[in-house]
């Protein structure tokens, strides 16, 4: 999601637009319980209102349903400003996986959050159909793409030191990504895990035969895609999974849920 929004901002800037991101970095924040990488902003309402007033935007897009997103939504509704939203993350499934909150409750909260926007942007036609069945309305497809100058087939030698075939995962190491389903699978060759997250220490200790590289970025990340034999994406909670497209662009077959 971060990379998608960063790319969007760069493209908008290239077209002569000014872009303001309102993020938790601008506020006092606390870590989300059991998920410290996600920061929850404390009492953002007043500062959000000031930032928007000072910037005087022509368009407002709310990308998350957390405290900043809610503060922005509240500000827009009070002022009568139109805004759009996007559905990036299956928080209902995340909450069920981590805290056993019924998914129906989670989707009820999400549906209420998104209903007042001009439109809700969704990543895939399948997700549009699913959310429509759950009662969401006024959705538009917002497809994703990757930089084909960066992600392209190339030199495969980086992972030659490992027994092939090499099965690669790239992404956050967290329980909702179902990485253990991949690590438990009886597969030949080597499993390589690129990324970081709250589950990393536990997974490294439990699965000694897997190779954990930590996070990789830019050209270095591309080289891992290029050198692998199969990309594996075991998550059932992602709305899109941009890493799948990155792997395909590098000429690597993908094993994932439809």
Residue ranges of predicted features:
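N-terminal subdomain of nucleotide-sugar transferases
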Residues: 1-27
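Nucleotide-sugar donor phosphate/pyrophosphate-binding loop at the beta->alpha transition
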Residues: 82-84, 93-112, 122
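Donor nucleotide-sugar binding/catalytic pocket of nucleotide-sugar-dependent glycosyltransferases
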Residues: 107-154, 213
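Conserved donor-binding/catalytic core segment of Leloir-type glycosyltransferases
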Residues: 121, 158-192
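Nucleotide-activated donor-binding/catalytic signature segment of Leloir-type glycosyltransferases, i.e.
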Residues: 200-219
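Short alpha-helical donor nucleotide-sugar binding micro-motif in glycosyltransferases
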Residues: 215-216, 223-228
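Aromatic "clamp/platform" in nucleotide-sugar-dependent glycosyltransferases that forms part
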Residues: 236
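Short hydrophobic beta-strand element within catalytic cores of glycosyltransferases
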Residues: 253-256
């Amino acid at each position: 999601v971060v990379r998608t929004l960063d790319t969007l901002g760069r493209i908008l800037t290239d077209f002569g637009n000014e872009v303001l991101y309102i993020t938790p970095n601008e506020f006092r924040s606390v870590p989300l319980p059991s998920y410290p990488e996600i920061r929850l902003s404390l009492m953002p309402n007043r500062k959000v209102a000031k930032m928007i007033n000072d910037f005087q935007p022509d368009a407002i897009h709310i990308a998350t349903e957390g405290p900043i997103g809610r503060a922005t939504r509240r500000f827009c509704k009070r002022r009568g400003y139109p805004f759009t939203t996007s559905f990036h993350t299956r928080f209902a499934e995340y909450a069920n996986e981590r805290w056993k909150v019924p998914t129906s409750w989670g989707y009820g909260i999400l549906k209420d959050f998104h209903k007042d926007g001009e439109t809700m942007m969704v990543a895939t036609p399948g997700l549009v159909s699913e959310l429509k069945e759950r009662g969401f309305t006024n959705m538009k497809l917002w497809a994703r793409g990757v930089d084909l100058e960066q992600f392209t087939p190339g030199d495969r030698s980086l992972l030659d030191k490992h027994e092939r075939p090499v099965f690669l995962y790239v992404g956050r190491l967290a329980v909702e990504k179902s990485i253990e389903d991949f690590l438990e699978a009886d597969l030949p060759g080597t499993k390589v895990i690129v990324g970081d997250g709250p589950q990393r220490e536990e997974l490294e200790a439990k699965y000694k035969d897997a190779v954990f590289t930590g996070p990789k970025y830019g050209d270095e990340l591309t080289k891992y895609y290029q050198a692998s034999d199969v990309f594996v994406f075991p998550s059932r909670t992602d709305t899109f999974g941009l890493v799948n497209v990155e792997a395909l662009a590098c000429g690597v077959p993908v094993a994932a849920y439809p």
